[in-house]
Amino acid sequence: MDQLKVAEAKLLRGAVISKLYMTYGTDIRIYALKNLLRSKGLVQDEDLKKTIFYLGGDGKRYIHVEVNKEEWRDSMIWLTPAGVNLAEKDIEDVGVIFDDE
């Protein structure tokens, strides 16, 4: 993966955390999250899936997803307390870049 793709992936992760922080306290569907990310340009489903796997994976757990097996974009997603800490910059993750940095 080239450096530009790596940077784009890190920025998308930061954007997802930021958007979920804006809606903290409310579970939203991945469809809605994708719409919130429109300002970042067209987000491909595959890139969003990779981002969700990264942010919700073992050792991270910044987000939680209640998976809808029939339509993954209809799954519910929300920020965990660890995700709030990341959004508030109480903790750092080298794999996440926030747009304001």
Where does each model-flagged region fall?
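A short glycine/serine-rich beta->alpha loop
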Residues: 3, 69-70
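Short amphipathic alpha-helical interaction segments
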Residues: 42-58, 74
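Short, amphipathic alpha-helical interaction segments positioned at domain boundaries
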Residues: 74-101
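Short acidic, hydrophobic short linear motifs in intrinsically disordered regions
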Residues: 26-39
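A short, conserved structural fragment
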Residues: 56-69
